[in-house]
């Protein structure tokens, strides 16, 4: 019997812009009749997976594209030789001013610094829930789809596996943006986000599920994804951009770390490391020297990197916005100083540049971790990518937190470092030093991949080894003459409510959801950097 699939709100917008096949062209924008698993496969591609879009202005309020500008690895560019060019002012207006509310942890994250206007804060929330709802529809409809041949049965399993994986990844993002970090002591009462698993419109008002309920659903989805995608493995041509059993295991390992379930985190990391389809990038990839005329051969995270297990969505840091110049974002000097001189990531990931007029820049650029090009549509996203190095880091952390497994933790840590640091000699750590070294390595390896913010949150509630710190962001504001007007210093203290985002105001008003406390934030310091006679 034919069934109508109502892809509430999202399908019309997404399917009509995706070339998925004739099936999608035969039906109206808001109603689709599916009769085969292949139809649902097309819907999965068009309305569940995230597209890769070239973000000219870098970080965005969509798709959680702001994650890499709110942690302690980023700041804003400053040059003591600021020129008289007005380009920096134009850059500031385009890149930084509109994301001020996120960068400075404001009550109204959509606030534009220069204009004072406030944009909607619901783009990420709304998009993720639309994609989740489309997953719910697909999982509901696929039960009745014919799968009486080997080919159809394989697709039947695979589509379900991918759908469960995607729902888990999106709920994990929502939970960590709009809920507190998972705390085993309080997870049964801490409010998280609404948990919607049905394909139809609910008649009752939504309420916020508890952190434990949401994480239980995430784990359940990932276990199902692992099972289905083991029964029907992802073909090699699709592995990078479609979920696989290895991707499910790696994400599940991360989820267990968040839950402080060290034993299960280790098991899932081991499963990834044992896979014949997973390998670490060798030191040779980092040893390739940048070519001034063709950077492609020197970039680390590209489609050619064998570490990439899964990637979707856009790259919000690959353009010119992280070049460290006046009016742009820069890499925090503190992060740069963590790398030893023989660590090849130091010279590959980062570099000092010059202004457009070749005057020196005092700030660091994010160089060749990704391919950096203006208006570039990267094939490797900066938020939702999963890669092999994380499995080694997850294994090291999980073992470091367990009694009697310090040697295993060191083994995983040393193997990763041998593929990153020239002439590296294996190290043996114990106790607190081991945990600190694992966390240090995680920061150095996974910087600007959308993980540091969540790591800082979970370290603060770690029962075995809590860690908290103050984050300082300096907002350098240029003038229209290219010099600086002011420098504003903002601090995010430990346990600050801003570690949890406010429920979007439109959603809050409609569903009457319990609020997340968040407060207005003023700079702790304001000073004039450079003031010319003309100013």
Spans of model-derived segments:
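Sec-dependent bacterial lipoprotein signal peptides
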Residues: 1-18
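Membrane-proximal, proline-rich intrinsically disordered regions
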Residues: 20-80, 269, 335, 339, ...
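Extended ligand-binding clefts on enzyme/binding-domain cores
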Residues: 41-66, 70, 209, 213, ...
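Conserved, well-structured interaction surfaces
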Residues: 94-178, 209, 227-230, 378-386, ...
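Inward-facing hydrophobic residues that define packing positions of alpha-helical scaffold repeats
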Residues: 132-135, 215, 222, 269, ...
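Short coil/linker segments at helix-helix boundaries
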Residues: 154, 177-216
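TPR-repeat structural position
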Residues: 215, 262, 405-406
